[in-house]
C-alpha cells in the first residue's frame, strides 16, 4: 500500500476497524483497504501512521434512496439520491471515503466526486478505472432524479447537495451502504 493516492497524490487515509497490542508492546491497526474484494483489510503498525479521530459518518439507504451525514451519532444532513441500476447495483457494506476529488467545471460528475473504498460487484473496469464506486454530483447526461436507479453503482447527488456533503467529510470517513 503506497502512502499516497495514485489519482491525487494526497496522503492515504484509511478507516481503522480494530486495534491490537502484542505482548511485545507493539500496536497494530486493522484497516479497510481501497481494493478488491470489497471489505478487504490489512494489519499495519500503529507506529507507521498518524491517527486522527473523525466524528463523521455517512449512511446511504438503498431502500429510501437517501444519504445521511452524522456527526457524533446525530443526523446533520439528509439528501435524496439516485443509485445503481438493477444490472449494476450499488454494493452494500461498510466502506470509507478514499479520495475527495474536485472535478472540472464541465464534468458530468458535478463539482465533486468522493471515491469510496467500494467497488462494483459486477463491473471490474469502468471508464478506464477499476470499477470504484463514488458519491458524486450529477449534471448533464448523468443528471438523475432522487429515488431512481440509473447509475453503474455510484451514488448520484444533486450538485447543490454534494456541495453540502463535501465540507462535512474527509478521506477515512466511514460510509455504510445499507438495504
Q: What are these model-derived regions, one by one?
A:
Residues 1-6, 76:
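Local beta-strand/beta-hairpin segments that build beta-sheet-rich folds
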Residues 4-48:
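SH3/SH3-like beta-barrel superfamily modules
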Residues 7, 22-25, 55-57, 125-127:
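SH3-family beta-barrel domains
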Residues 32-60, 71, 77, 83:
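Boundary regions of SH3-family modules and the immediately adjacent low-complexity/disordered segments
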Residues 40-42, 77-79, 93-95, 131-133:
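Short beta-strand segments
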Residues 67:
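Gly/Thr-rich phosphate-binding beta-strand-loop-beta motif of the actin/hexokinase/Hsp70
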Amino acid at each position: 500500500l503506497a502512502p499516497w493516492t495514485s489519482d491525487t497524490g494526497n496522503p492515504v487515509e484509511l478507516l481503522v476497524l480494530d486495534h491490537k497490542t502484542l505482548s511485545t508492546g507493539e500496536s497494530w491497526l486493522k484497516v479497510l483497504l481501497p481494493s478488491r474484494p470489497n471489505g478487504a483489510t490489512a494489519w499495519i503498525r500503529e507506529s507507521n501512521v498518524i491517527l486522527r479521530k473523525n466524528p463523521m459518518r455517512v449512511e446511504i439507504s438503498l431502500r429510501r434512496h437517501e444519504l445521511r451525514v452524522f456527526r457524533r451519532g446525530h443526523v446533520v444532513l439528509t439528501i435524496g439520491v439516485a443509485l445503481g441500476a438493477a444490472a449494476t447495483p450499488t454494493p452494500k457494506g461498510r466502506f470509507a471515503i478514499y479520495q475527495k476529488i474536485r472535478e472540472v467545471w464541465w464534468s458530468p460528475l458535478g463539482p465533486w466526486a468522493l471515491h469510496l473504498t467500494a467497488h462494483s460487484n459486477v463491473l471490474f473496469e469502468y471508464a478506464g478505472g477499476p470499477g470504484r464506486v463514488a458519491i458524486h454530483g450529477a449534471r448533464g447526461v448523468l443528471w438523475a432524479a432522487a429515488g431512481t436507479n440509473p447509475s453503474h453503482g455510484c451514488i448520484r447527488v444533486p450538485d447543490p447537495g454534494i456541495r453540502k456533503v463535501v465540507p462535512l467529510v474527509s478521506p477515512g470517513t466511514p460510509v455504510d451502504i445499507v438495504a
